[in-house]
C-alpha cells in the first residue's frame, strides 16, 4: 500500500471528481486570495527602535514623544514602507474591523494572524464617523499643526506635502508615489514654497496615504512632512466642493432607495409564496389526520365517542325536571290557596 502525504490547506483529493459530469468546474480554495505576509520579522525589531527622547511619554500610535520639547521638527526617514501588491492579503480580521495602522506604515509583524485588515480602503467599507479608517478617535477640531487623526466635524480629502526637493517633474513624481493608495482628483504644486497639495477621491484614501507616506522619500533623499490641508480660500474651489457634496448626497439617497425597493420586491415574493406552502402543509396534515381519527385505542373510536357525548347531552335536556312555577297552571291553584 502506497503512502500519501497529508492534505495541505489548498490540496484537493482527485478521487472525489470521478463521478462528476465532464462539464463540472472545480473551484479552488485559493480563490480566497493570498494570506497577508509578514512585513517585518519580529526578532529584527529592537526594543529601543524609537526616535530620540524629547519628552516624558512615548505615543506608540503617533511614534513621537509628548510632555516635553516638541519633536515635530526632527524628521527622520522611516525604515519601513508598505508595498500594496506584496503586503496585501487576508487576515483574521472580523467583518467590522478597521484597517491595520502598522500595515499602512509597513511594519506589521503579525501577517495573516493580524486582527485588522491588510488592504486599501474600499467604497463598501463603513467606518464610524467619529473614527478614521484605522479605528482611532477623531477630535472636534484639528490640531494646531494640522497633524494627527483629523476632525469629525468636517470631511477632508486633501493632504499637505512638505519637505519636497522641487524640480520640473514634481507633479508626475507625486502622482507615481501617491496613486498606489487611491484615486487622485488633483495635485497642486507650489514651487515657491516647496510644498504641494494632493486631493484624493475619498477621505479614507487620504487617511491611508497620510500614514503610508509620512516620513518617506520620493525619488531623492528628502523626508516628507504630511499634514491635513486647510480649507481652500478660493471661492470657486469652495463652490466646487459644495456641488461635489451635493452629488455625493444625491447618489447616496439613490442607492438607499434602490436597496429599499429591492428588499420590498423580495418581501413581496416571499409573502405570495408563503400562503401556498402553508395551505399545502395544512391540507396534507388534514389528510394525514383523517385515518388517525378513525383508529383509536379502546372499544370505541373517536367518532363513536363524540356521538355518545352528543346523545348524552340531549338526554339530560329531556330528563331535566320542569320548574315549580309551572305547577299552579296544571293543578288550578297556587301554593297560597293551599294554605
UniProtKB/Swiss-Prot annotation:
The keyword Plastid does not apply. The lineage of its organism: Eukaryota, Fungi, Dikarya, Ascomycota, Saccharomycotina. It is found in: Nucleus. The keyword Ubl conjugation does not apply. This is Pre-mRNA-splicing factor CWC2. Residues 292-311 have a biased composition (Polar residues). Belongs to the RRM CWC2 family. It comes from Debaryomyces hansenii (strain ATCC 36239 / CBS 767 / BCRC 21394 / JCM 1990 / NBRC 0083 / IGC 2968) (Yeast). One of its GO terms (cellular component) is post-mRNA release spliceosomal complex.
Amino acid at each position: 500500500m502506497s503512502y500519501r502525504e497529508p492534505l495541505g490547506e489548498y490540496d484537493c483529493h482527485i478521487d472525489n471528481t470521478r463521478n462528476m459530469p465532464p462539464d463540472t468546474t472545480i473551484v479552488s480554495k485559493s480563490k480566497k486570495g493570498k494570506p497577508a505576509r509578514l512585513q517585518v520579522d519580529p526578532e529584527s525589531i529592537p526594543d529601543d527602535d524609537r526616535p530620540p527622547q524629547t519628552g516624558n511619554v512615548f505615543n506608540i500610535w503617533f511614534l513621537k514623544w509628548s510632555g516635553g520639547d516638541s519633536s515635530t521638527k526632527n524628521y527622520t526617514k522611516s525604515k519601513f514602507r508598505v508595498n500594496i501588491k506584496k503586503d496585501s492579503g487576508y487576515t483574521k480580521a472580523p467583518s467590522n474591523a478597521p484597517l491595520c495602522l502598522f500595515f499602512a506604515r509597513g511594519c506589521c509583524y503579525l501577517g495573516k494572524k493580524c486582527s485588522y485588515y491588510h488592504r486599501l480602503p474600499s467604497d463598501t467599507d463603513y467606518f464610524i464617523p467619529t473614527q478614521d479608517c484605522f479605528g482611532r478617535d477623531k477630535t472636534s477640531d484639528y490640531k494646531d499643526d494640522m497633524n494627527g487623526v483629523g476632525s469629525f466635524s468636517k470631511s477632508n480629502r486633501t493632504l499637505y506635502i512638505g519637505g519636497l526637493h522641487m524640480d520640473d517633474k514634481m507633479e508626475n513624481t507625486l502622482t507615481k508615489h501617491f496613486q498606489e493608495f487611491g484615486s487622485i482628483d488633483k495635485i497642486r504644486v507650489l514651487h515657491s514654497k516647496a510644498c504641494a497639495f494632493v486631493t484624493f477621491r475619498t477621505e479614507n484614501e487620504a487617511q491611508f496615504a497620510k500614514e503610508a507616506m509620512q516620513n518617506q522619500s520620493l525619488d531623492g533623499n528628502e523626508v516628507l512632512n504630511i499634514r491635513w490641508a486647510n480649507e481652500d480660500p478660493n471661492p470657486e474651489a469652495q463652490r466646487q466642493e459644495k456641488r461635489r457634496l451635493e452629488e455625493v448626497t444625491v447618489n447616496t439617497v439613490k442607492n438607499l432607495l434602490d436597496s429599499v425597493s429591492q428588499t420590498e420586491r423580495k418581501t413581496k415574493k416571499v409573502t405570495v409564496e408563503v400562503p401556498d406552502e402553508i395551505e399545502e402543509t395544512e391540507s396534507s396534515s388534514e389528510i394525514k389526520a383523517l385515518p388517525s381519527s378513525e383508529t383509536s385505542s379502546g372499544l370505541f373510536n373517536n367518532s363513536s365517542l363524540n356521538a355518545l357525548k352528543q346523545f348524552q347531552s340531549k338526554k339530560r335536556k329531556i330528563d331535566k325536571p320542569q320548574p315549580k312555577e309551572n305547577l299552579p297552571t296544571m293543578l288550578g291553584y297556587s301554593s297560597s290557596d293551599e294554605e
